[in-house]
Amino acid sequence: MEVRTIKHYSNCLNRDMEYQVFGSGGKPVLFFPCQGGRFFDFGGNNMPATWSPWIESGLCTVYCADSIDNEAWAALGCDNRWRIENHERWYHYIVDELVPEIRRLQEQAGSWQKGIMTFGCSMGAMHAANLYYRRPDLFDRCFAISGLYDNKEFFGDYCDDLVYNNCPVFYLNNMPADHPYMNLYNSQKSLIVVGQGAWEDVLLESTRRLDEVCCRKGIHTRFEYWGYDVNHDALVAQNGTGLPSLAAGIRKL
């Protein structure tokens, strides 16, 4: 399997950023690591083994983004506005700088077609879902596993314009029925899953809230509630019960 590590300068973040690429050609998949994770975690958690049938056959290329969660969502105790402004800068790094990089590499491989799939576990799932729902014009698939989709766990009762714009439960709930994104959501595919085992309680509750919003608004997202034997650590590590379910989820997209 071809693996590349690429470093480039981000004007949005005023620093060098790195990302890793697995494969060449096919559908671009943008992976986000767990809370405080790094761009090399996809390989470190042995996820290429699960994705290898698609990567090796040229059906997809996985791009692994870096995070700044420890300066944003996970920087508990720091000023809330500072935290969410940092996240918003990272968001613009993804959509304004990394997405064009992905397009450039896909064009070099002769396989660029509009639309990128987002994928992540835990906090990576939150990023995957948020980017998909905020920019369905850029991202046409989403696979989110065991994530939080509102602000309560990280910001409590604090909510400003940027927190609102990064919580799908909030902004989807208030999206007008005639918003052009509605047609995009309903012509694309998104899969959000959560376990019902140990350490999934808060994540399960947040997933149900998003499920309720999507049902009420007529947004076609598939929600799956995996078994009571599926705990958070298994999903994040992608071993044990999580591994076959992950492969099954990929096939649905």
Where in this protein do the model-derived segments appear?
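Non-catalytic cap/lid and distal C-terminal segments of serine-dependent acyl enzymes
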Residues: 1-253
